[in-house]
Amino acid sequence: HKASGNPSPPVLICVLNGAFMFFSDLVKDMGIEIEVDFIRARSYTGTDNSAGVSFTKELEIDLTGKRVYIVDDMVDTGKTMNAVKEKVLKGGAPDAKGRPQDVKVVTLVDRKSGTYPVDFTCFPEMGEEWFVGYGFDLNGLCRNYRNIYDSKA
């Protein structure tokens, strides 16, 4: 991370609840010093995401001048990620003094129909199935499955 010209460690932000399993595995294998923070954003009720985005856990780290990676399970419409990124760009913690140096988006799954630009993804161009397992849920259940499944399979 020092090769970036920024001596401070990067900050990885986990978007709860969906990204917690992916985030945990990712940070364990980073091999460099990092800071972590968590934000909880909700835009789905069941499989419906027509409501607005609400936050029930805010960022605590001052992100001023830092390289930030927002880690989520999936970017679907981009509504949740837009809201999260807006908070990150304001500097994170309520007492933040400025903006981050750089912000990247990391996802486990990227939809084929996705219109939101993702910087890093593990599974690009996935279909429109509703996934369960490995953090993905259906009405709050199934997150603890070790693998990802199509909920209708």
What are the residue ranges of the model-derived segments?
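PRPP-associated nucleotide enzymes
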Residues: 1-153
